[in-house]
Structure formats: C-alpha cells, structure tokens
A protein has these predicted regions:
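Protein-protein interaction and targeting regions used for scaffolding, dimerization, and localization
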Residues: 2-220
Length: 220
C-alpha cells in the first residue's frame, strides 16, 4: 500500500478534459490548445480552492485568513493568466504527451474524479504524527507541522506541474517565464503558511493540518 493525495475534480471539468484527449488521440486536426489550456487552468484552480480557500473560509473569524485569501487569489490569477497562454503555443501532436501524463494522475471512484499524486510513506507518517501532537495540545509543534504540510504540497506541485511541464519542451524564454511564475506563486503560498505559524494557535493549526490530511489516503 502507498499513500497518495486525492484531490476532487469537478465532473464537467473532467468531461472537457476527456473530450480533448479523445480529439487528440483520434488525430482531429482542429487545434485543441486553447481548450486544453482553459481546462487545465480550471483543474489547477479547483485543486487550490478546495485545499486552501474552503479551509480559510471555515476560519474567517481569524483576521489572518483575510491576508491568506489575498495570497491565494494572486496565485489563482497567475494560473488563469499563464496556463492557457503557455499551452497556446503548441500544435495537437505536441499536446499528447502532456495529456497522457495527466490522464495517469486521474482516478475514478464511485462516480467521483480525483487528481492524485504519491507521497513518500516517511513524509506521510511524519505529518500524521505531527497532527497528533497538535491535537494533544503541543504548541511547539505548529511550525514543524506547517513545514511538513508545505513539503506535501510541494510534492504535488512537482508531480502535477513541474514534471508535466517538461512534456511540452518549451523554448528557453517561455520555460524561464513559466519557471518564474511557478517559483513566484509557490513562494507566495509557502511564505504565507510559514507566517501563519507565528500567528495562529495550536488548535487552529491542528484544524489546518487535519483538513489537509483528509485528502491523504492509502492507494493500492
């Protein structure tokens, strides 16, 4: 058994992705670049919204979450701007490796669609242990728990963004631009999580970590 993160994708978004994949594999000559760029940006935003924004909205009574939500909106805006733009450069044949890579991350279960990525067992056990310490009232565990949470999220960024980006083999200028966007957005998110460590109490930290753990489960 392996541990993986399961992130829900809306059925209509998945249906659009599946349709584009079918068009590409059947050799349809009509360009799929714009449609694919839009659907991938929606997938990315759905993932970010369910992991972060829903959590922050549950804790709106804490003033710190307002600043967090602004950071997340910046990230969503960058995704909606740059992902469709980056995909638009390519003909259909160049899109197939990317679509096939991403299709392998999708998992259907009980009429629900998940985008998944694996997490090393050691990291999974560490964050679960850290969560238990927070639940037991260990205030000193807050910073470590949020750091581990950042590590789990970054594994997802690598598996779902950095690695599939390689499939497209961008030219130097575009690749450098996209790397800058990825680095900027992840830095914003990770710095915000780090800052939260000094602003929230143990109980709220436990809520944050436990919420994310709900996305992690065993995968056969």
């Amino acid at each position: 058994m392996k541990t993986a993160v399961f992130l829900n994708i809306h059925a209509d978004t998945y249906a659009r992705f599946a349709h584009i994949r079918t068009q590409l594999l059947q050799g349809n000559k009509e360009s799929q670049a714009n449609a694919l760029g839009n659907v991938l940006s929606e997938m990315a935003c759905e993932v970010i919204e369910q992991v972060f924004i829903v959590l922050l909205q549950q804790n709106q009574q804490h003033s710190q979450t307002g600043e967090s939500e602004k950071v997340i909106q910046q990230i969503l805006e960058a995704i909606r701007k740059y992902m469709p733009w980056s995909i638009s450069f390519f003909g259909n044949d160049r899109l197939i490796p990317l679509v096939e890579y991403l299709s392998k991350t999708l998992y259907l279960e009980d009429e629900r669609i998940y985008m998944t990525y694996p997490v090393k067992q050691q990291l999974a056990e560490q964050i679960q242990a850290s969560s238990q310490k927070l639940i037991q009232g260990d205030h000193a565990e807050i910073l470590k728990a949020l750091k581990l949470l950042t590590e789990v999220i970054d594994v997802g960024v690598t598996h779902l963004i950095r690695e599939p980006k390689k499939c497209l083999k961008f030219n130097f200028v575009v690749d450098k631009t996209l790397n800058g966007v990825i680095n900027m957005t992840t830095h914003l998110g990770y710095k915000r999580l780090e800052k939260l460590g000094s602003q929230i109490d143990q109980q709220l930290a436990a809520t944050y970590v436990d919420y994310f753990l709900k996305f992690m489960r065993q995968q056969a």
